[in-house]
Amino acid sequence: MTTFETPRETVFIESVDSIPQSKKTHVFAICVTVDNKPIVAARRSSFVFQEITMNMNPPIVVTISKHLTNYMYNNEIKEIKRKLQKGSAPIYKTSFEELILLGGKLNKSETIDDCIRREIKEETDSKLTIKSIGTTCVKITITDKLFNRKYVNYCKLCYIDELMEEVISFVIYNVEIRKLKSLLDCDNNDKFNYLRFIYNTLLYSK
């Protein structure tokens, strides 16, 4: 097991022989282009903003930690600022981007690979053509330090027919995904080191 610490997450990564076939299972994929480059996605909204807005009751924010704004998009910060009461702490702009892997929760009637195929189709507006899905897998256990939440996910590689140049040019209208990106271009992101480790582990364990 390998551990990564970021300012907002503690991440445990371990190779596993199989993925539980359960409706509680969350499975994701790092897609690999035909020119051998790994793909991640940028989320339309940040997890921090989602958490804050889901728990606004009443829907007025009295104050918000500057630390939380480091993990929000600028349009979200403006929205929160609009709801802030007079005299609350200032909010600063960030260059934040919420990276995620493509995938999601397993349906009862699906296999693991069926779930990956369905989620990738939905999240990319059917833009990616899947050739094959790898057989090796890793278990990813994430503790969110900001909200004290724990998540258990699984990940595989998914090989596609498109070149990276094509992938990054796609316009995505999915409600959750704003665009697809090369993981290798995201080295300034707080998730980069552990996402790259996951990719390399899956790639060289095949």
Swiss-Prot record:
It holds the Pfam family NUDIX. Mg(2+) binds at E110, E123, D144. One of its GO terms (molecular function) is metal ion binding. Residues 23-206 form the Nudix hydrolase domain. PROSITE patterns: NUDIX, NUDIX_BOX. Its EC number is 3.1.3.-. Induction: Expressed in the early phase of the viral replicative cycle. The active site is at E119. It is an enzyme of class 3 (hydrolase). Belongs to the Nudix hydrolase family. This is mRNA-decapping protein D9. It comes from Rabbit fibroma virus (strain Kasza).
